[in-house]
C-alpha cells in the first residue's frame, strides 16, 4: 500500500502516493512505491507476492500564494495552514469527533480529501484527467504524480 505518504498530518505538502522519491530532497523522502518494493524484496519477501495499491484520491491544502509558487512553478514541498484545511469533495463532511485512535480532528475538522471523480466533477481536472483550463498544475517527474 502506498497511500497517504503526505497529508494534513504532515509538516509540508507533498505527493499523496509517490511512485518514486529518490530524487526528492533528502528531508522529503518519506517513502514511495519504489522504496517500499525495494525494502520488502531486500527483506526476502517474494517479489511475485507483492501487490501494490495506489489511491484514487488526493489531499487539498490552504497554501499562501507567496509560498505556493516560485516564478511560475508550483512548489511541491511547502508549508500549509494546518488550521484552515479546505473542505474536500461531497463525501468529506467536517468532523469534531476524535478518530478511532482517540486523536482530535486536525485543524477545523475538514480532511480536505478529494476522490478522483470529484477532481473531475469539481473542475480541477478535465474529463481526460489532465489539469483543467484555468488551473495551475504540473507533472512531477520525480514522484511521477500530477499536482493540480
Model-derived regions: residue spans:
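Hydrophobic, secondary-structure "cap" segments at the distal end of domains
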Residues: 90-148
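Substrate-binding surface in catalytic domains of secreted glycosidases
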Residues: 1-106
Amino acid at each position: 500500500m502506498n497511500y497517504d505518504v503526505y497529508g494534513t498530518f504532515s509538516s509540508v505538502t507533498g505527493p499523496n502516493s509517490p511512485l518514486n522519491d529518490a530524487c526528492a530532497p533528502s528531508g522529503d523522502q518519506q517513502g514511495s512505491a519504489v522504496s517500499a518494493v525495494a525494502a520488502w524484496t531486500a527483506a526476502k519477501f517474494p517479489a511475485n507476492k507483492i501487490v501494490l495499491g495506489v489511491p484514487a484520491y488526493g489531499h487539498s491544502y490552504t497554501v499562501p500564494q507567496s509560498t505556493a509558487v516560485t516564478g511560475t512553478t508550483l512548489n511541491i514541498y511547502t508549508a500549509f495552514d494546518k488550521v484552515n484545511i479546505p473542505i474536500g469533495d461531497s463525501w468529506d463532511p467536517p468532523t469534531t469527533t476524535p478518530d478511532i485512535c482517540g486523536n482530535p480532528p486536525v485543524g477545523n475538522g475538514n480532511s480536505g480529501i478529494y476522490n478522483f471523480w470529484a477532481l473531475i466533477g469539481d473542475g480541477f481536472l478535465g474529463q481526460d484527467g489532465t489539469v483543467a483550463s484555468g488551473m495551475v498544475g504540473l507533472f512531477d517527474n520525480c514522484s511521477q504524480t500530477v499536482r493540480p
